[in-house]
Design a protein with these regions (language model features):
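N-terminal lobe of the biotin/lipoate ligase/transferase fold
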Residues: 1-132
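Short loop/edge segments at beta-strand edges and connector loops
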Residues: 53, 140-142
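Short, basic and Ser/Thr-rich N-terminal targeting/leader segments
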Residues: 45, 70-72, 142, 151, ...
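Long, positively charged amphipathic alpha-helical accessory segments at protein N-termini or as interdomain linkers
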Residues: 1-11, 15, 110-138, 148-291
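Short loop/turn and capping residues at structural boundaries
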Residues: 22-23, 141, 181
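Conserved active-site carboxylates
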Residues: 145
């Protein structure tokens, strides 16, 4: 990459991601596992794919484009996110060309009240792909995480844009492929990566496998709603049957997780009876842990 190709407006220098200026060309000390656009297009022929080297956030970029045109069937990927976002305003850390930062646009014909389980459906799509890749100990965590043996490997952030009677879902997915120890320490919670779990596929191959599985899950959700996913979610849910605490702002409710409902809501058996919680600004933790 020539230095003049470096994106303007980013509070980031090439050296931050390991690039060095050698004779007027920005280079890496070791060749990174870059995403291959042609292979992505061949593996995902129904999608319009854009691979960006450095971007603020793939979700932010797609939201900007959604203001002017449809983003259905579009897939944005970034080698590096300078401002990746997670749920509840958190930052998603993503070193250059070592993890996956991607956003999928999907048209949803169901009305907004029926989309409560959407993040769970996406999580199950990712989890299914990981199991097919041979990863053991795959779990999901309500409402939007995928885990390996209790440690987070994938995060999901979904934003919705109204389109007539339906909407378009802007589905952001971050997947840890290869994490260094210092990066794990920065995350602030138990984190897993795919390489440590025995996955040898390239980032391009992983992207194709993950997105194919997510698209298949979305198609099933569009046709049948969330009811088809309840049993498998309960089976894979990290906290199913356990004593947990649900936090909503200053409110904290404890009880046993008994499952999820037909709109993806969490069902908690409490001392005062059954309570149901929807996603958004809600945190779920084991009863003896802190958020």
């Amino acid at each position: 990459m020539p230095p003049e190709a470096w994106p303007e407006g980013l509070d980031l220098q090439p050296e931050t991601i390991g690039l060095h200026n050698e004779g007027g060309v920005l280079r890496f000390a070791q060749p990174p596992d870059l995403l291959r656009s042609q292979a992505l297009e061949a593996g995902l022929p129904t999608l319009q794919i854009e691979v960006m080297h450095v971007v603020d956030s793939t979700n932010t970029r797609m939201m900007q484009h959604a203001a002017d045109a449809s983003v259905a069937q579009k897939l944005y990927l970034a080698e590096f996110q300078a401002g990746g976002r997670g749920r509840r305003g958190r930052t998603w850390l993503s070193p250059y060309a070592r993890n996956l930062s991607m956003t999928l646009g999907a048209a949803m014909s169901r009305p907004l009240p029926q989309l409560g389980g959407l993040s769970l459906v996406v999580g199950l799509g990712l989890a299914s792909a990981l199991e097919d890749l041979g990863v053991e100990g795959v779990q999901v965590k309500w409402p939007n995480d995928v885990l390996i043996n209790g440690a987070k490997v994938c995060g999901i952030l979904i934003e919705l844009v109204q389109r007539g009677d339906g909407c378009e879902a802007i589905i952001g997915m971050g997947v840890n492929v290869r994490l260094a120890e210092q990066e794990r320490a920065q995350i602030g919670q138990p984190a897993a990566d795919l390489v440590s779990s025995g996955v040898t596929e390239s980032r391009t191959e992983l992207t194709v496998a993950l997105i194919r599985s997510v698209v298949a899950s979305l198609e099933l959700f569009e046709a049948h709603g969330f009811s088809r996913f309840i049993d498998i979610f309960n089976h894979l849910h990290r906290f199913h049957g356990e004593k947990c605490a649900v936090t909503m702002g200053a409110q904290r409710v404890t009880g046993e997780v008994v499952g999820v409902g037909e709109q993806g809501e969490l069902i908690l058996a409490t001392a005062s009876g059954e309570q149901r919680f929807h996603g958004g600004e809600v945190s779920l933790r084991a009863e003896d842990s802190s958020d």
